[in-house]
Amino acid sequence: MSPRTALLLLIGLLWGLLWLGAGCARKNLTTPELYSTYCARCHGERGEGKGDNLALYPHLNLLTSPMVRRGDRAAVRQRIREGYGPMPGFARRLDPQELERLVDFTFQLAKERP
């Protein structure tokens, strides 16, 4: 094997390992970490709508959301997956299990509401 071929194979192997490692790291996020990564900036750490974007979009409170209050899991799942208005959809970023964990977490936050 020529040195050039060996170098190209080594670069390809390293690139592949980096790519796989980046995907694996995301998959190991706990549910609160998923929420912090994808949701908290707008919805706040506890779902209270006090995130960084509150001034731009004041209706971000998950705790008083009609969908959450009536227990509509399908609607919450759809909003997370497809987005709505200024909220982006996360279908390409979350696998089905992560999506379901975020739906569960949304309702958990509402139950913990003071």
PLM feature spans:
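Sec-dependent bacterial lipoprotein signal peptides
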Residues: M1-A25
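Gly/Gly-Pro-rich "capping" loops immediately C-terminal to redox-active cysteine motifs
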Residues: P32, G47-R77
